[in-house]
Amino acid sequence: MKMPKAIGLVHFIGIGGIGMSGIAEVLHNLGHRVQGSDQADSANVQRLRDKGIEVFVGHTADNLGDAEVVVVSTAIKKNNPELIAAREKHLPIVRRAEMLAELMRFRNAIAIGGTHGKTTTTSMVATLLEAGNLDPTVINGGIINAYGTNARMGEGEWMVVEADESDGTFLKLPADVAVITNIDPEHLDHYGNFDAVRAAFRQFVENVPFYGFGVMCLDHPEVQALVGRIEDRKVITYGENPQADVRFSNVRIDGTRSIFDVEIRRRRTGKIFSFKDLVLPMPGRHNVSNATAAIAVANRLGISEADIKKGLASFAGVKRRFTLTGEANGVQVFDDYGHHPVEIKAVLAAAREACKGRIIAVHQPHRYSRLSSLFDDFAHCFNDADTILLAPVYAAGEDPIEGASSEALVSAIKAAGHRDARFLEKREDLASQVAAIANPGDFVVLLGAGNITQWAAALPSELKSISGKSE
């Protein structure tokens, strides 16, 4: 039985979250009555209001109104007054992943999983399916620049979703195609140990039906090891590895574009198809790898080489994924969500390939627990930056942990051999410090999952003010 239309008013607690907002938008577009609440106004909240969805700011029991279903994410605490009121009324409480799973039952579904690269890969798959006239429905974990939103309602039979592994609920998603970009030891607060993370990703792929398939990155050692353990399901491998079914090669970086070739090998027939000089308007091998995953999916769904090339060339990117926020005096400023050492290393490597000048990295560590558990990795992930400015930790509600501070990380980075790592004590000092060291042709890359995105948006105009120039 699929979810009926007559389920009554659906209330989202925390509707402004990136995952919740996309589900709410698609439900609304399907004709359901939707409302919600969030603790603060935001761009996501305003976007939902613009679409006719009522959103309350603040959490009170009265916000429920005549709601008949309540949707919550794992971020909502048990003492939330709306959640308490919903339980007192004996309303159905639906977890975010469960509601996403219900939406997926209306379509053939592609779920993109992995510790890093999910949002970009989801966007790329959606772009290629759209280029192939499959008109997909999309629910992503980031704002797709071409849509101006993280959700899209299509008329086609396919849905593309980002599968969030952080709390294990991605195993509820009924995917026909499961993509794994990589597997790293993240979210151990939920899983307990890395073996449990490995087991979850194995289940993610083995959950696909017999007529579905997995798409797995052979360049990542954990994913490669998992490929050999998958039983009774079709798997397509991709990557730079010569053994991959869909292999990219001949990567050339041209400014902020990547140009590369892809070779597709059919295991059953041995046939080989070659796509030459694919153009992706993003730098970096990690983005080429993500694009290759999308190509593997699109090719298997019958999308032509011409449409794949057209779709890739038109890809407009994702908000906060190496996003240019402005330029001041020849210095370009970029905003990126990277907050894990693997992500930071990949972004800075891409910047190094694209930049003719120097790289100035500004990082705001996100959560004391992450900095503490990955401290050594953080100390070695900034090598492609010429200068590093480390802001205080964005706590995200956590208490400090001894030894897990930005000052300690600066010392560790220097001890690892980096020549120029500095502590940025106050946000107000950012523009003056950058202005003192940046020259025309340099890139300033701001990285983090906290409020550093606001710094990135403001920095170009602040740099212009310091130089006395304005446009």
Curated annotation (Swiss-Prot):
It is found in: Cytoplasm. Pfam families: Mur_ligase, Mur_ligase_C, Mur_ligase_M. Pathway: Cell wall biogenesis; peptidoglycan biosynthesis. Keywords: ATP-binding, Cell cycle, Cell division, Cell shape, Cell wall biogenesis/degradation, Cytoplasm, Ligase, Nucleotide-binding, Peptidoglycan synthesis. ATP binds at G114, T115, H116, G117, K118, T119, T120. GO terms for cellular component: cytoplasm. It catalyses: UDP-N-acetyl-alpha-D-muramate + L-alanine + ATP = UDP-N-acetyl-alpha-D-muramoyl-L-alanine + ADP + phosphate + H(+). Its main location: cytoplasm. One of its GO terms (molecular function) is ATP binding. Belongs to the MurCDEF family. This is UDP-N-acetylmuramate--L-alanine ligase. It comes from Agrobacterium fabrum (strain C58 / ATCC 33970). The lineage of its organism: Bacteria, Pseudomonadati, Pseudomonadota, Alphaproteobacteria, Hyphomicrobiales. The gene is murC.
